[in-house]
């Protein structure tokens, strides 16, 4: 009897121990998992923020938080504005007011040479005209999209007055030779150096007939004859003296590529984007088709980089493959094919930029100015003041007069399509109506309709278009706003 009771007690103890052991096995993994999740949270507190740092929604949320901080600072010291030295920058870091950098973001035949010249004429501006031309020429053939990162890195160096990057794309005189050392590079290798006000005036050119502060176009032949080339190091030293550095180019197709530069508080970058009626752009591109053919092919490769597109190029007489046998560039009908197709890619890039800026956070929009060529030539003085105010530059009566006179020339056309001269603004705006066929207009309007709508360019023949023609100088800029 006693033995039976003892066995029963031992059985109960064994059952209890087994139940406790089973419970322990179930609880331990659960406890470990709970601690593991807590550790993950402690180790990566900003995981979601890091993952979303490049989204506009996350940037906008950060902008709202930062705006509250800036407002509290402003309330504590009403004499200081959110952009004054010592306050928070747009990306939340303390910066001082230093050199201003401006990038003029445009495409071919939009009037960007005229816009850039307004900066070139200002005595407080160091201006570079399309320096990325060197990169495109050195890396041809290649599609525009694959070059965007290299263009951005080149811009970063140039804005810091470091021109050694140009050595990578300098063309040696002999194909068998190495590219010249940066110490031996001169201003003569820069694209369109003969019209640069800094290069063609004292102190870099003591014999120049005009001082740097004198407003007026530089005669390229006169500059070439009186201003011997100087080293790029001397140009770098001159660049560092100016409070504003402006670079104009047409080869950057995606505004979003510039976001890392815009977020860099040490760079203090702003962007001026120039648009133009795509029908006028197409008309101007057709007029200068041979000069834009290589560029158009590079843009067109952005859309189609596969074997099918290479076959299209070969069918039209162009060997697109590196190392392939050189072929003649296509004549007028085939050139028109490339120009029209490239314009479709450009309009797609415009639409992408417009949607990007429309949804951008406030800090980015403060660093962005949209300008239309038509508004600039109809109201040159008003738009110039708007441009200078955005760039932090003083107004000048001589520059006002220069802008007005450049838009009141005797004619639109010129024998040299890439030569800057005074133009008739009305001719410049409406020339496409007489020179493009109905089919060409239809093609452009079909390809560019979304961008045209956002920019308030009416389709030909509708009521708004007829009103624009009747009223002539009615400014259109106010109709193109951030809303769709």
Swiss-Prot record:
Glycosylated positions are 87, 184, 405
Q: Does the keyword Transmembrane apply?
A: yes
Tell me what topology the record assigns in the membrane. Answer: Single-pass type II membrane protein
The membrane spanning regions, by residue number, are 13-33
Q: Which Pfam families match?
A: Sulfotransfer_1
* UniProt-recorded Gene Ontology molecular function terms: chondroitin 6-sulfotransferase activity; N-acetylglucosamine 6-O-sulfotransferase activity
Which residue windows does the record flag with biased composition (Basic and acidic residues)? 460-473
Q: Where is this region: Disordered?
A: 71-90, 460-484
A single GO CC term, please? Golgi membrane
Biological process terms in GO annotation: carbohydrate metabolic process; chondroitin sulfate proteoglycan biosynthetic process; N-acetylglucosamine metabolic process
Residues with PTM Phosphoserine = 460
Membrane topology, Cytoplasmic segments: 1-12
Sorted alphabetically, which keywords does the UniProt record give?
Answer: Carbohydrate metabolism, Glycoprotein, Golgi apparatus, Membrane, Phosphoprotein, Signal-anchor, Transferase, Transmembrane, Transmembrane helix
Q: Which reaction does it catalyse?
A: chondroitin beta-D-glucuronate + n 3'-phosphoadenylyl sulfate = chondroitin 6'-sulfate + n adenosine 3',5'-bisphosphate + n H(+)
Main localisation, per the record? Answer: Golgi
Entries under Gene3D superfamilies matching the protein: P-loop containing nucleotide triphosphate hydrolases (3.40.50.300)
Q: What class of enzyme is it?
A: transferase
Which locations, inside or outside the cell, does it occupy? Answer: Golgi apparatus membrane
Give its E.C. classification number. Answer: 2.8.2.-, 2.8.2.17
* Residues given in the record as 3'-phosphoadenylyl sulfate binding sites: 108-114, 276-284
The residues on the Lumenal side of the membrane are 34-484
Question: What functional role does this protein have?
Answer: Sulfotransferase that utilizes 3'-phospho-5'-adenylyl sulfate (PAPS) as sulfonate donor to catalyze the transfer of sulfate to position 6 of non-reducing N-acetylglucosamine (GlcNAc) residues. Preferentially acts on mannose-linked GlcNAc. Also able to catalyze the transfer of sulfate to position 6 of the N-acetylgalactosamine (GalNAc) residue of chondroitin. Also acts on core 2 mucin-type oligosaccharide and N-acetyllactosamine oligomer with a lower efficiency. Has weak or no activity toward keratan sulfate and oligosaccharides containing the Galbeta1-4GlcNAc.
Q: Which family does it belong to?
A: Belongs to the sulfotransferase 1 family. Gal/GlcNAc/GalNAc subfamily.
* Name by which UniProt lists this protein: Carbohydrate sulfotransferase 7
């Amino acid at each position: 009897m006693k033995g039976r009771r003892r066995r029963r007690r031992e059985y109960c103890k064994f059952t209890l121990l087994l139940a406790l052991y089973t419970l322990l096995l179930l609880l331990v993994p659960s406890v470990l998992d709970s601690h593991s999740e807590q550790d993950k949270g402690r180790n990566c507190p900003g995981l979601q923020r890091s993952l979303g740092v490049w989204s506009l929604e996350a940037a906008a949320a950060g902008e709202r938080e930062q705006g509250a901080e800036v407002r509290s600072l402003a309330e504590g010291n009403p004499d200081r504005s959110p952009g004054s030295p010592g306050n928070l920058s747009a990306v939340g870091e303390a910066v001082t007011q230093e050199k201003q950098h401006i990038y003029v973001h445009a495409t071919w035949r939009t009037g960007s040479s005229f816009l850039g010249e307004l900066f070139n004429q200002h005595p407080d501006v160091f201006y570079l005209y399309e320096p990325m031309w060197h990169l495109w020429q050195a890396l041809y053939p290649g599609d525009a999209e694959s070059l965007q990162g290299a263009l951005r890195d080149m811009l970063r160096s140039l804005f810091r007055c470091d021109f050694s990057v140009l050595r990578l794309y300098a063309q040696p005189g002999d194909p068998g030779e190495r590219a010249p050392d940066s110490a031996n590079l001169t201003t003569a290798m820069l694209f369109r150096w003969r019209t640069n006000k800094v290069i063609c005036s004292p102190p870099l050119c003591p014999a120049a007939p005009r001082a740097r502060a004198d407003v007026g176009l530089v005669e390229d032949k006169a500059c070439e004859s009186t201003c011997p080339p100087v080293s790029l190091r001397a140009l770098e030293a001159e660049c560092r003296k100016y409070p504003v550095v402006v670079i104009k180019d047409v080869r950057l197709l995606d505004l979003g590529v510039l976001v890392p530069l815009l977020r860099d508080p040490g760079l203090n970058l702003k962007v001026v984007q120039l648009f133009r009626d795509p029908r006028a752009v197409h008309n101007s591109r057709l007029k200068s088709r041979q000069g834009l053919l290589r560029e158009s092919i590079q843009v067109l490769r952005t859309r189609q980089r596969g074997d099918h597109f290479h076959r299209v190029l070969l069918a039209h007489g162009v060997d697109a493959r590196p190392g392939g046998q050189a072929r003649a560039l296509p004549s007028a009908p085939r050139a028109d094919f490339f120009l029209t197709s490239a314009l479709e890619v450009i309009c797609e890039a415009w639409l992408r930029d417009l949607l990007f800026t429309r949804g951008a956070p406030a800090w980015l929009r403060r660093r962005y100015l949209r300008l239309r060529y038509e508004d600039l030539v109809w109201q040159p003085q008003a738009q110039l003041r708007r441009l200078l105010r955005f760039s932090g530059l003083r107004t000048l009566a001589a520059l006002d007069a220069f802008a007005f006179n450049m838009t009141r020339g005797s004619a639109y056309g010129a024998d040299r399509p890439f030569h800057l001269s005074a133009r008739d603004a009305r001719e410049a705006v409406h020339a496409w109506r007489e020179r493009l066929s109905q089919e060409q207009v239809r093609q452009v309007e079909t390809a560019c309709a979304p961008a045209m709508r956002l920019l308030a360019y009416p389709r030909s023949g509708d009521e708004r278009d007829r009103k624009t023609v009747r009223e002539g100088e009615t400014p259109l800029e106010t109709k193109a706003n951030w809303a769709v």
